[in-house]
Amino acid sequence: MIDFISARIKLPRPLPVPVNGGLFVRFDEHGEVERTTALRKRVVGSHETALQIRAPGVHELEVTGNPVKFVQGHNLWGTSCPVTALWAAMVRLEALGALPVPLRALGLLGPSTLAESAEFSRVDCTAMLLADRWFDVETVLRSLRVAGRLRDRGASGLPYPWPESQGGGVTFGGRPGQSARHRQLVFYAKGKEVKVHPLPECIGDDPQLNEWLARCLRCEVRLGTNYLRKRGLRAPAMWTEERAGMEWTEMMERMDMNGSEERPEALAGLPPRLKAAYGAWLAGMDPQSIFPRSTFYDYRRDILKALAVDIAIPRQSEPSAEIVPFRRVIELRPAGRPDFADRIDALLASNG
């Protein structure tokens, strides 16, 4: 499903008047206007959800926010095509009177015209995985915080946990809240997130929905400007539902659980210097405090390649002889669109 989008639309026909939420004016020391910047205008859509729009000039329109949530009041399920999502949001903006003229008057006749005129600077592809029990989601998140890492991303591939007040999720590829110009992978418990950012009142207390959400692990792949440019994905015409699914799957496949697969044959072939560094890590020591900086990163790279173990992540302590360790397999499956989705959408429509 598509979540957050930032897009700039080059309008085939100009706007008759500016579209903004006011102006920021900067004066120099003599009181002369030095610069004027149009501010984003917040437009409230379905069930108090909002998009931000701004026209830097009469020939351009910027749209930022969650188009699926703006149109239907939630982002629990929805379209996986960013062009479809953006067009639906544009139609809603027109219906709300947020645009000075109809879309047709701007030369935007449908999704195909929009795809030819727009350019993306951020696209979030997301999906939810469903566990059998709510506490399985918390167990997976704890494991990701301790042992998760993004392959071949260096320090930015390490986990950055969220505060519990924000839902207790974890971000890979940059710190939480940091604008990602490349890619980020974000995990959080959807059941907790809807307590921080409540659902519309008409569905917020639905027991069937809340039980389902409590078992959902949200997995968001955030694609920034540099990545979209590198992959030729700034043009909406390059996007389909299949493309969004490919981007999500590719990023998820880069996720490793540090040291989850032991490879004794690879360990036997390590040079002595790498065995020493790996042995220090196994013993619970911090190799970064033992070796010079450049040496540590050389060792880290080579051990990561040979063993799929990142010695920059502290090793989990082994249980003592008095403790019998238990491991269990947690199965997560695609949540998809639940059986009761039509009922929830009908409630939202009747209370919209």
Model-derived regions: residue spans:
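Helix-turn-helix DNA-binding segment
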Residues: 296
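Structured, helix-rich domain cores that form ligand/interaction pockets
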Residues: 1-288, 309-352
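Residues in the recognition helix of alpha-helical DNA-binding motifs
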Residues: 299, 306
